[in-house]
Amino acid sequence: MISYSVKQLASLVGGIVEGEPEIEITGISDILDAKKGQITFLSNPRYEAAVEKTQASAIVVSKSYKSSSPITLIRVDSPSLAFSQIISLFSPQPFSYEPGIHPTALIGREVEIGKEVSIQPYAVIEDKVKIGDGCVIGAYVFIGRESIIGEKSFFYPHVTIRERSRIGKRVILHPGAVIGSDGFGYEQTNGRHEKIPQVGIVQIDDDVEIGANTTVDRGRFGKTWIQEGCKIDNLVQIAHNVIIGKNSIIAAQTGISGSTSLGEHVTLAGQVGIAGHIHIGDGATITAQSGVTKDVPPRAVLSGRHARPINLTHKLEVLYNKLPELWERLKKLEKKYDGDSPRPEADPYNS
């Protein structure tokens, strides 16, 4: 059984022990389910009450956290990041993939395959594809002709990469991701929707990770561009000619319409909808289920169906919840000061 002392774990993450440094830790868990011998972490204030109830032997917390519990703590700058390092000690070893080409894989003409590449069963690699050193191409992956794949990229099963795509180094694509499908472009002619040719490409830079069943459409011309370090969740739709700036993060079920650009370090929470041909400034945050229809300045935090500054959205929500009370007060005032004036024909809160 793998075990480490609290002191050893604190040394690994650069933390300070508060409590018993020699306690042996044999596993990891979340704060609600942790048992004796396990270590957990606290980064979200919502779970502070769980500290008093957890059975964990130790907790990784922030340096500023104030505790009245006798439980042993490891104080660090970032509990989540530190706990990620600890997880790696107790996690199973990652699977290794034997280099080579499975006999069921189909390899086209003039394909260039680097060193230590693993191509799994039933993968299809079309003509003139270039694959860098150390890549893993999962089962049933399709890579279209003239695409270029950077070294140490990892494509899980059933990834589709259409022709002429440009994929950087250390890119991770999860199952069902589709890169380079046609953009949604049509022109109405004589009452019919005529397809507009989509002749651009998709460029994905180094260290990008894209979740399961996410789709990135090729440019109408030019390119759809996901820049270095972006992390994109499952079930995201990225339309033609979108540009996503470095180190941006996009949560599930978000949709970005064509020719919109995001600056660097932008955060889009779940189910955000972004209109086309607008720009989201560097460092902006859009909260869940917001709809954005116009440019967003740098570092703005927007929220709501019609995305507004988040403080304004909160004020409007408070006022909205008070409308029934305000309506009753208004009726009483009207009755008091305008006793003979006609009343509204319908009460919007009881009709």
Curated annotation (Swiss-Prot):
Q: Which PANTHER family match?
A: UDP-3-O-ACYLGLUCOSAMINE N-ACYLTRANSFERASE, UDP-3-O-ACYLGLUCOSAMINE N-ACYLTRANSFERASE 1, MITOCHONDRIAL-RELATED
Q: What does this protein do?
A: Catalyzes the N-acylation of UDP-3-O-acylglucosamine using 3-hydroxyacyl-ACP as the acyl donor. Is involved in the biosynthesis of lipid A, a phosphorylated glycolipid that anchors the lipopolysaccharide to the outer membrane of the cell.
Q: What is this protein called?
A: UDP-3-O-acylglucosamine N-acyltransferase
Q: How does it assemble?
A: Homotrimer.
Swiss-Prot/TrEMBL catalytic activity: a UDP-3-O-[(3R)-3-hydroxyacyl]-alpha-D-glucosamine + a (3R)-hydroxyacyl-[ACP] = a UDP-2-N,3-O-bis[(3R)-3-hydroxyacyl]-alpha-D-glucosamine + holo-[ACP] + H(+)
What gene makes this protein? lpxD
The GO molecular function terms of this record are: N-acyltransferase activity
Which SUPFAM superfamilies does this UniProt record tie to the protein? Trimeric LpxA-like enzymes
Q: Where is the active site?
A: H240 (proton acceptor)
Pfam families, per this entry? Hexapep, LpxD
The UniProt entry's sequence similarity note says: Belongs to the transferase hexapeptide repeat family. LpxD subfamily.
What keywords sit in the KW lines?
Acyltransferase, Lipid A biosynthesis, Lipid biosynthesis, Lipid metabolism, Repeat, Transferase
Which pathway does this polypeptide act in? Bacterial outer membrane biogenesis; LPS lipid A biosynthesis
Q: Could you mention a single GO BP entry for this protein?
A: lipid A biosynthetic process
**Highest classification ranks of the organism:** Bacteria, Pseudomonadati, Verrucomicrobiota, Methylacidiphilae, Methylacidiphilales
Q: Which organism is it from?
A: Methylacidiphilum infernorum (isolate V4)
Carries keyword Lipid biosynthesis? yes
Q: Does the keyword Lipid biosynthesis apply?
A: yes
Q: Which CDD domains match?
A: LbH_LpxD
